[in-house]
């Protein structure tokens, strides 16, 4: 493929611009032809080689133009270009080899060469070294890695031999040391990505299971065995034909993704960012259907490729290690299994002989011996070879099912499930789990694939089982010991999202799967019903806590009635905590912990006292006052002071807050006179970033809007706001906030001072700040929805708002409400990835619910403010 102008006598530097102008469109046209062939489905491996060949020709012509034939210099391709692989926007790595004197003598000619190549449009990266300098530079194994894949472009046999000698194992990095360095580098790189490829925006090149892992294996093979590709290791007995074929297939899959990503992004982009995912999926032919988006199919294929590469890579790394260290004397374990250099090995050559019971016996041994480093490569390969022949649970015999349940009831059950999932055994035993393996959801709420999220949920359950207090989960360690059969919670966690992507309600469909599994594994009817109910209702506690007013006895009564028993409540609470915390590292926070704990205790009390006769309002008020009074008395306050402060607090306050919050509010009010403004802030939970802000103030137009705008400007996100009318025309505002960005310093005193300063001024001049929408959020835009309903027995209007999340959203909503002369009485703020789902209870300025005309005017104003288009 010609990509350069014809060779011609060198007219000197003056003609370089004309040469580059002629070469540039030829290179562009070559890329366009390759792009067309890519879209037609030609193998990516061939396209990479053709592009490298086109650039080779340009390089040779440019070299001939700029460098004299007798210069004593040679030109070599290194790195990926040296492998003969050149992606559309990748750097072109070059080495100019020559002795120092030759380098100095032709310094200007080399500068001219590099300038000419840049002028053509090639993103070159170059080094100019002597053989001795190559040896010195190769002390850095990353430099050696680039050099060992060198390919001569303009070099005679002597130059090629000099470079080979300079970086020979006898000179630098013998095979064993190189292997160890590369293995450590691989592990460190994996850790940078959280040791998983299942991120929302994975890195195709450097992420776990990515192209870099395959290249690392190739570098090790080249240094240790002198072979250019992994397929050559088949004949040496280090790689099976099936493994080599699988790696080649997955390499083509990832290379095609990367090639397309470079074209779509028009830059050397290695991460599958949201900016490009949909466009790339369309280009690669992934179409939407009723069950899955095309982009979700593309990402699932990537995640599965990465998982398979990691499985095979683990086996190869272990074999390379054995090549250097030799076979170890086995340490016998129970019958049929032993340890070799810490790796668990099945002793029989015929293991597992298609017997899933033997496979489960392997995992039982793994769980029983903490010293096991992993699975021996021979055993892992034997397992992989028979994996597809192992029966699923619904056709396996009763012995196999009993063995699986024994693993769930045995030690380190969650670790066992993780291992089974990674090795493909769990998906083979439960085919529905295989269906969600690698399945992503194209949103910002679910940051893991469904299978990885499920495993995260199980890990959280294991954390609860440890029985230690954890600052993230305030009461899980207290609830866990009450579980009659912990394995039932594991089953609920395993099945709660297993029906994702089938269409329909995944909770209901998953419950059907869970019931079938439990019955097949001979669980009792009661245990089966509990697991089935947990899967079907696994979202109920989260939705109730985050979207309903759990200080309302009717809400608690409905929830407790649904739950029915203390046992169900215990299991559901733990499953809900594990589920939310396993959805995203940022989703779980102190407020959610406290919210769920409050709902748990309220429901537990309702169940204890009986659902037929919930306590009347007056009794609840009396109990709240007495509990708060006891706390204040312990702080040294006398009854007269307590009575005076309680008289200044609205009755509704005693129904909405816990006794310790009431005591804090009442004690704070001692400092203020009627008509004055009080602002207090404190840490809601010790050693946590969550803050509670209490504002007592004369009612003023724009008060709520000014507070919200100030909190937003100071970098705090509001999770809950409660606004109550107090005696003497005062307002009780309580906000639960968390630092949202780096501008929030987390100091409650400074935040309170900032609010006091704002509230001392003209509230009507306070405006929401303007901030840019983060990159990720820009790709999930949709029209806002505003719905109205009655609340508080018809005395108020409830707004349910669903809109694309963005910085300052709540401040903008509060500003719209102020401009419409509306009063906010309650606000519940919930964010689910890119979606904000907020609820407000409002009235007009005369404390009346909104009529239809006012509702429509408010809807129009909110949509105009929040519509991303």
From Swiss-Prot:
The keyword Transferase is assigned to this record: yes
Q: Where is the ACT domain?
A: 692-771, 798-869
Q: Which reaction does it catalyse?
A: [protein-PII]-L-tyrosine + UTP = [protein-PII]-uridylyl-L-tyrosine + diphosphate; [protein-PII]-uridylyl-L-tyrosine + H2O = [protein-PII]-L-tyrosine + UMP + H(+)
Task: Using the record's annotation, list all stretches that form the HD domain.
Answer: 450-572
Annotated stretches, region: Uridylyltransferase: 1-332
Q: Which UniProt keywords apply?
A: Hydrolase, Magnesium, Multifunctional enzyme, Nucleotidyltransferase, Repeat, Transferase
Q: EC number(s) of the enzyme?
A: 2.7.7.59, 3.1.4.-
Function per UniProt: Modifies, by uridylylation and deuridylylation, the PII regulatory proteins (GlnB and homologs), in response to the nitrogen status of the cell that GlnD senses through the glutamine level. Under low glutamine levels, catalyzes the conversion of the PII proteins and UTP to PII-UMP and PPi, while under higher glutamine levels, GlnD hydrolyzes PII-UMP to PII and UMP (deuridylylation). Thus, controls uridylylation state and activity of the PII proteins, and plays an important role in the regulation of nitrogen assimilation and metabolism.
Q: What is known of its domains?
A: Has four distinct domains: an N-terminal nucleotidyltransferase (NT) domain responsible for UTase activity, a central HD domain that encodes UR activity, and two C-terminal ACT domains that seem to have a role in glutamine sensing.
Protein name, per record: Bifunctional uridylyltransferase/uridylyl-removing enzyme
Recorded source organism is Xanthomonas campestris pv. campestris (strain ATCC 33913 / DSM 3586 / NCPPB 528 / LMG 568 / P 25)
Q: Which gene encodes it?
A: glnD
């Amino acid at each position: 493929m010609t990509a350069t102008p014809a060779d011609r006598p060198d007219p000197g530097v003056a003609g370089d611009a004309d040469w580059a102008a002629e070469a540039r469109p030829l290179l562009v046209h070559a890329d366009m032809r390759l792009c067309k062939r890519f879209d037609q489905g030609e193998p990516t491996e061939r396209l990479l080689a053709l592009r490298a060949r086109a650039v080779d020709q340009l390089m040779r012509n440019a070299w001939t133009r700029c460098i004299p034939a007798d210069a004593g210099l040679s030109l070599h391709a290194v790195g990926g270009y040296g492998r003969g692989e050149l992606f559309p926007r990748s750097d072109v790595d070059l080495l100019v080899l020559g002795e120092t004197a030759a380098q100095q003598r032709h310094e200007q000619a080399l500068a001219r060469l590099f300038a000419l190549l840049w002028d053509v449009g090639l993103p070159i990266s170059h080094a100019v070294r002597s053989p001795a300098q190559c040896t010195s530079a190769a002390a850095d194994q990353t430099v050696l890695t680039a050099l060992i894949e060198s390919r001569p472009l303009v070099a005679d046999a002597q130059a090629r031999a000099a470079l080979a000698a300079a970086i020979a194992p006898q000179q630098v990095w013998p095979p064993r040391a190189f292997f160890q360095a590369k293995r450590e580098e691989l592990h460190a790189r994996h850790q940078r990505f959280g040791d998983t490829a299942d991120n929302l925006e994975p890195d195709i090149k450097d992420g776990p299971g990515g192209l870099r892992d395959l290249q690392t294996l190739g570098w090790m093979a080249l240094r240790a065995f002198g072979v250019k590709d992994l397929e050559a290791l088949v004949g040496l007995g280090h790689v099976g034909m099936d493994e080599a074929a699988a790696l080649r297939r997955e390499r083509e899959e990832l290379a095609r993704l990367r090639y397309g990503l470079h074209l779509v992004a028009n830059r050397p982009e290695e991460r599958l960012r949201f900016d490009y995912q949909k466009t790339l999926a369309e280009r690669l032919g992934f179409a939407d259907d009723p069950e899955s988006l095309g982009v979700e199919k593309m990402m699932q294929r990537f995640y599965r490729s990465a998982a398979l590469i990691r499985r095979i890579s683990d086996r190869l790394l272990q074999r390379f290690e054995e090549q250097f260290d030799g076979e170890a004397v086995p340490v016998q374990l129970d019958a049929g299994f032993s340890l070799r250099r810490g790796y668990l090995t099945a002793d029989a050559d015929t293991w597992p002989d298609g017997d899933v019971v033997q496979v489960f016996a392997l995992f039982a041994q793994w769980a029983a011996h903490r010293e096991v480093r992993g699975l021996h490569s021979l055993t892992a390969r034997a397992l992989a070879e028979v994996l597809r022949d192992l029966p699923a649970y619904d056709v396996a015999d009763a012995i196999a099912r009993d063995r699986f349940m024994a693993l769930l009831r045995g030690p380190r059950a969650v670790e066992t499930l993780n291992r089974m999932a990674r090795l493909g055994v769990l998906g083979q035993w439960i085919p529905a789990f295989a269906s969600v393996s690698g399945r992503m959801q194209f949103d910002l709420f679910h940051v893991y694939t469904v299978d990885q999220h499920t495993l995260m949920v199980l890990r959280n359950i294991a954390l609860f089982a440890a029985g230690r207090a954890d600052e993230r989960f305030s009461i899980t360690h207290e609830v866990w010991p009450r579980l009659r059969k912990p394995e039932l919670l594991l089953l609920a966690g395993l099945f709660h999202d297993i029906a994702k992507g089938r269409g329909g309600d995944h909770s209901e469909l998953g419950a059907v799967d869970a019931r079938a599994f439990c019955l097949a594994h001979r669980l009792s009817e009661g245990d089966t019903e509990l697991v089935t109910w947990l899967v079907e209702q696994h979202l109920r506690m989260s939705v109730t806590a985050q979207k309903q007013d759990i200080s309302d006895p009717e809400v608690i009564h409905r929830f407790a009635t649904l739950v029915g028993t203390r046992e169900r409540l215990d299991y559901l609470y733990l499953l809900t905590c594990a589920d939310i915390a396993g959805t995203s590292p940022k989703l779980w926070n102190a407020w959610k912990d406290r919210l769920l704990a409050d709902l748990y205790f309220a429901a537990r009390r309702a169940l204890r006292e009986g659902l037929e006769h919930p306590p009347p309002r007056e009794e609840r008020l009396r109990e709240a006052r007495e509990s708060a009074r006891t706390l204040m008395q312990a702080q040294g306050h006398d009854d007269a002071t307590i009575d005076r402060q309680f008289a200044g607090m609205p009755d509704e306050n005693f129904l909405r807050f816990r006794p310790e919050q009431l005591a804090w509010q009442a004690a704070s009010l001692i400092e203020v006179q009627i008509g004055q403004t009080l602002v207090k802030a404190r840490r809601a939970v010790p050693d946590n970033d969550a803050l509670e802000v209490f504002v007592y103030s004369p009612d003023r137009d724009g008060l709520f809007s000014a507070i919200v705008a100030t909190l937003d400007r100071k970098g705090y996100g509001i999770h809950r706001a409660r606004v109550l009318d107090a005696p003497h025309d005062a307002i009780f505002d309580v906000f639960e906030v968390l630092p949202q960005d780096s501008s929030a310093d987390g100091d409650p005193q400074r935040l309170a001072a900032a609010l006091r300063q704002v509230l001392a001024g003209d509230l009507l001049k306070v405006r929401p700040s303007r901030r840019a929408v983060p990159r990720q959020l820009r790709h999930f835009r949709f029209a806002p929805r505003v719905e109205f309903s009655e609340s508080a027995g018809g005395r108020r209007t409830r707004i349910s708002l669903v809109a694309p999340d963005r910085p300052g959203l709540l401040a903008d909503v509060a500003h719209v409400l102020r401009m419409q002369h509306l009063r906010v009485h309650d606000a519940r703020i919930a964010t689910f990835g890119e979606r904000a789902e907020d609820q407000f209870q409002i009235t007009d300025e005369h404390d009346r619910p909104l009529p239809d005309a006012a509702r429509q005017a408010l809807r129009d104003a909110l949509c105009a403010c929040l519509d991303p288009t």
